């Protein structure tokens, strides 16, 4: 029988523990982890994500500051705001919600964030730490998936992991984290030939392609572990993953649902990295 990897339950467990760690940090050092989230414009999906992050941060005892800015803000003005947060000792994590308006270069915005406060793990200095095998701030979705593997005792050593999607947010950092655990990794993308033949070789299949119900059971080997990173809306507005859950659950040994799988863990890892940044600030 297929086992459900319950990201919602794991995130609740981790956030409860995080709340206890935050309380200890406050008692011992007088520090409350501070997270600043910057939202530019009024993208509906981004607004939902930001509200969820804000709620989770407050529930875990964090200081949470959300700055909502007009879509017309200039790149220079946004960078100035980031620099102010870089200097603010009560803020330990800075997150700029993507996507940004077209007139703003997201790479320059990411570069403006102090790497020690880059809780999304997108700054080149943090990606460098990741590639060198000494990760500090790791992109939150891959970090959350690794926690799922730990919690559910998924053995990675020597296993063939196939990732669909090569983004800097999920695919590439996910590949590096799996390599660090001695998995054999294949990174596929939209130009990969005979994709379903490649994915059918996977012991572990991670799908982050951003196309609703793209992966059917024809893509999946019997007994594979399937992680669905997709967050899409169908024609009725229902939230669906990149995987046809009902089909793939027939052949997979373990699978994440959408919603309630990877999404909650992404937010939990954002908070965990903000807490770790606050903890590091104690010894500075």
From Swiss-Prot:
Q: What is its EC number?
A: 1.5.1.5, 3.5.4.9
- Keyword line: Amino-acid biosynthesis, Histidine biosynthesis, Hydrolase, Methionine biosynthesis, Multifunctional enzyme, NADP, One-carbon metabolism, Oxidoreductase, Purine biosynthesis
Q: In which pathway does it act?
A: One-carbon metabolism; tetrahydrofolate interconversion
Q: Which residues bind NADP(+)?
A: 165-167, 190
Q: Name one GO molecular function term.
A: methenyltetrahydrofolate cyclohydrolase activity
Reactions performed catalytically = (6R)-5,10-methylene-5,6,7,8-tetrahydrofolate + NADP(+) = (6R)-5,10-methenyltetrahydrofolate + NADPH; (6R)-5,10-methenyltetrahydrofolate + H2O = (6R)-10-formyltetrahydrofolate + H(+)
Check the record and name the InterPro entries matching this protein.
Answer: Aminoacid_DH-like_N_sf, NAD(P)-bd_dom_sf, THF_DH/CycHdrlase, THF_DH/CycHdrlase_cat_dom, THF_DH/CycHdrlase_CS, THF_DH/CycHdrlase_NAD-bd_dom
The record's similarity note reads:
Belongs to the tetrahydrofolate dehydrogenase/cyclohydrolase family.
Q: Which NCBIfam families match?
A: PRK10792.1, PRK14179.1, PRK14186.1, PRK14188.1
Q: How does it assemble?
A: Homodimer.
HAMAP family registered for this protein in UniProt: THF_DHG_CYH
How is this protein named in the record? Bifunctional protein FolD
